[in-house]
Amino acid sequence: MQYSEIMVRYGELSTKGKNRQAFIGRLNGNVTRALHEFPRLTIRPKRDRMHIELNGEPSDQVMARLSQVFGIQNFSPSIAVEKDMDKVHAVALQLMNETAPKGISYKVNTRRSDHDFALDTNAMNLDLGDYLTDKRPDLVVKMHQPDMILRVEVRREAIYLSTKTIQGAGGLPVGTAGKAALMLSGGIDSPVAGYYALKRGVDIEMVHFFSPPYTSQQALNKAKQLTAKLTPYVGRIYFIEVPFTEIQEEIKAKVPEGYLMTVQRRLMLRLTEAIAQQRGDLAIFNGESVGQVASQTLESMAAINDVTTMPIIRPVATMDKNEIIAEAEKIDTYDLSIMPFEDCCTIFAPPSPKTRPKTDRARYYESKIDVAGLMDRALAGVKIQEIKSSDQFMNQDQDVIAELL
């Protein structure tokens, strides 16, 4: 079936009142970026719907991209027909023949923005219903919860017919909730946290700590590839690489083993906050889940959060590990996340870290190191890269990956 357009229905935008136009404008920009590889498209955002005219572009490929754009409740591929009922009948029958299996139930549902058209909504429903009953007597008309709905939109320029409704990604358009930094470790949890942040309309930047020679180039490439996995939802994400070797070595030399992880996480948070403030980010997201590891007990979180007043948001905080894994598989980050390249959270990890560290002790041990100097040197070495969904960082690592797996 050659579709003419895709009709997009908004998600939570319907609740946004006076901000509705700003949300629609942001969604229009996000959709335009997501579909930039299809130059013949015409995108027309309206108050209650968005219409994407295909102009010969492949509908399946366009819909696959569209399904990853947050802020969309659902969408329907549609066929434009001249406002001639004989032609509408013919296309409606063709559409039902191609999409409606024998014996299913259906109803006709008409919306009319062109009130000058000869038939009103009820008359249109009856006209098409009678025609289809005559041509497809195997179909059963059912007004409540039918198997299929033939949707009809009567607009000024044409009549649009559709039988498919495809679920969108939901959520809010990315960027409508502001911008934040995400602490990306390379494990399973933080990419899922990033996905949830994007879904709530937050434009995220990835902050990744890199400690050569203790962490490898493969570990860095893995973190970049995880970022690329999330970019289809937003178009591009900035990846901020923070050198952390000197800080880790200094902490290992001067801080008791039980507090290594706590002080290390405090420095990570200090650096993330500094970067966030420089770049206008309003909050910090991470992949912490309460009680999952020693640094994620409530006592540990309190001792670590002590260094910042910036909001710390933990989207997966109350999820079980199996729930996080299921979401990682759904967004296609799980297989990457479990590749066994050490990151800076695992090197120097003590065998028995404090699970209930005291904030005053953490402050005391942190005072033994030159926090300001270490941070200045780390921030001076920060590298920032814009990552897009088409970027590939793991290709050169295939032989290494094959050996590991």
Curated annotation (Swiss-Prot):
Main location group: cytoplasm
InterPro entries to which the protein is assigned, alphabetical: Rossmann-like_a/b/a_fold, ThiI_AANH, ThiI_fer, ThiI_N, THUMP_dom, THUMP_ThiI, tRNA_STrfase, tRNA_sulfurtransferase_ThiI
CDD domains: PPase_ThiI (cd01712), THUMP_ThiI (cd11716)
EC numbers, comma separated: 2.8.1.4
Sequence positions that bind ATP: M183, L184, H208, F209, R265, G287, Q296
Function summary: Catalyzes the ATP-dependent transfer of a sulfur to tRNA to produce 4-thiouridine in position 8 of tRNAs, which functions as a near-UV photosensor. Also catalyzes the transfer of sulfur to the sulfur carrier protein ThiS, forming ThiS-thiocarboxylate. This is a step in the synthesis of thiazole, in the thiamine biosynthesis pathway. The sulfur is donated as persulfide by IscS.
Protein name in the entry: Probable tRNA sulfurtransferase
Organism of origin: Lacticaseibacillus casei (strain BL23)
